[in-house]
Swiss-Prot record:
Comment on protein domains: The N-terminal domain is essential for RNAP assembly and basal transcription, whereas the C-terminal domain is involved in interaction with transcriptional regulators and with upstream promoter elements.
This protein's name: DNA-directed RNA polymerase subunit alpha
Keywords: DNA-directed RNA polymerase, Nucleotidyltransferase, Transcription, Transferase
Catalytic activity entry: RNA(n) + a ribonucleoside 5'-triphosphate = RNA(n+1) + diphosphate
GO CC entries: cytoplasm; DNA-directed RNA polymerase complex
Any GO molecular function: DNA binding
GO biological process: one example: DNA-templated transcription
Listed HAMAP family: RNApol_bact_RpoA (MF_00059)
Length: 329
């Protein structure tokens, strides 16, 4: 039975099948109908294009001036050697680039295991063949490895470095992603009576520098962080200029003379230092009757005048008197 139309099923990680040290299958279910392709395609694109990794970016080979040449005593031509170097799986720890060296002579293959490097560099595929020496052949090369993301063709860097690039520095197309292959499949899933749900199976292979499960976790984190901007999206409202409301009704700040009381009543209030209407309304009837020469007739007059202005005796005014009155006094 389907729940509320505003509620969506939350998938769970069903299992991780390790096919090999570099390949794994990750299964997620149940997903709402159509979400299998939505999430599968998004994760696939991120895994292929947005995962950081290391790649060979430059190579210098002794005796070689450009890539369209060959080297005596080496079976492969220079272009083939560069293609083989692109297959190196390197891990850099604590730095963004490193220069590796290879020096070897004598007949036989030159592999990644022959590379000399620092302790903060790891070669994940030491059996990878770089080239093959024949007879008395020898080779010496310097390999620059950098950290990056996505795919950066050599032509993009060649234009920027043309003036500074030394002769013999061979630029290499760099594919930084540690993910070699990623595919996904969407199967049917069932929860209770619902049979229209999706099951997402991600089949991924890396170059050995990153665990497949960790790659999925990183890709999911990247996707979630990018979507956060939409989750926090709010309508942009114009800031309204709110007029500051006065602390007291303006009538309370006016002098008692504005009440136009009789001379007798006005003089009695002045004798008691009641200067403002705000002072007057805080007085109680009993208190005013104690004022010399102010009788019940004057009290009735004061009450009637205040009532006509929506005021009365015995009111409580917090923070009275205001600073403006104190300053004027």
């Amino acid at each position: 039975m389907q729940g509320s139309v505003t509620e969506f099923l939350r998938p769970r990680l069903v299992g991780i099948e390790t096919v090999s040290p570099r390949r794994a299958k990750v299964t997620l279910e149940p997903l709402e109908r159509g979400f299998g392709h939505t999430l599968g395609n998004a994760l696939r694109r991120i895994l292929l294009s947005s995962m950081p990794g290391c790649a060979v970016t430059e190579v210098e080979i002794d005796g070689v001036l450009h890539e369209y040449s060959s080297k005596e005593g080496v079976q492969e031509d220079i272009i083939e050697i560069l293609l083989n170097l692109k297959g190196l799986a390197v891990i850099l720890e604590g730095k963004n680039e490193a220069v590796l060296t290879v020096t070897k002579s004598g007949e036989g293959p030159v592999t990644a295991a022959d590379i000399q490097h620092d302790g903060d560099v790891t070669i994940a595929n030491p059996d990878h063949v770089i080239c093959t020496l024949t007879g008395e052949g020898s080779i010496s090369m310097r390999i620059k490895v950098e950290m990056g993301r996505g795919y950066v063709p050599a032509s993009a860097r060649r234009d920027a470095e043309e003036e500074d690039r030394a002769i013999g520095r061979l630029l290499v197309d760099a594919s930084f992603s540690p993910v070699v292959r990623i595919a996904y499949d969407v199967d049917s899933a069932r929860v209770e009576q619902r049979t229209d749900l999706d099951k997402l199976v991600l089949d991924m292979e890396t170059n050995g520098t990153l665990d497949p499960e960790e790659a999925i976790r990183r890709a999911s984190t990247i996707l979630a962080e990018q979507l956060d901007a939409f989750v926090e999206l709010r309508d942009i409202k114009e800031v309204e200029q709110v007029e500051e409301k006065p602390l007291f009704d303006p009538i309370l700040l006016r002098p008692v003379d504005d009440l136009e009381l009789t001379v007798r009543s006005a003089n009695c209030l002045k004798a008691e230092a009641i200067q403002y209407i705000g002072d007057l309304v805080q007085r109680a009837e009993v208190e005013l009757l104690k004022t010399p020469n102010l009788g019940k007739k004057s009290l009735t007059e004061i009450k009637d005048v205040l009532a006509s202005r929506g005021l009365s005796l015995g009111m409580r005014l917090e923070n009275w008197p205001p600073e403006s009155i104190v300053d004027n006094d």
